[in-house]
Amino acid sequence: EISAGVAPGSDYPVFDTRFGKLGMMVCYDGFFPEVARQLSNRGAEVIAWPVWGCNPALAGARACENHVYIVSSTYEDISRNWMLTAVWGHFGEPLATASEWGTVVVSEVDLGAATHWNSLGDYKAQLPRHRPEWGVSP
């Protein structure tokens, strides 16, 4: 990729779109919780994640850890149970899942849904306080 002019980035951009604030992880990025956290801290409400394959539990974990929707898209054959094309909710559950290879998944989500957990209060508002970005003052 580097020889073709693609270089690694050093930022985690979030884009304002007509359907919400969108961040993106690419494949291996999703294996590290810090990537989704940086996107969430920057205001992402939805994180798109094209990924060749991995344990589907990672998509649920990234959604739950950061109270964002994860939209995973994979080339993997669903029958291998290696990754899913799906929309994942705030609690880490798949809201919609592709039933076969090569299909599209659609799910309506509520970006205004409360991020309140009974024992923690407004969970998403607490994230920057508990896991601040390294080197940045609140």
State what each model feature region is.
Residues 14, 76-138:
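C-terminal beta-strand edge segments of enzyme domains
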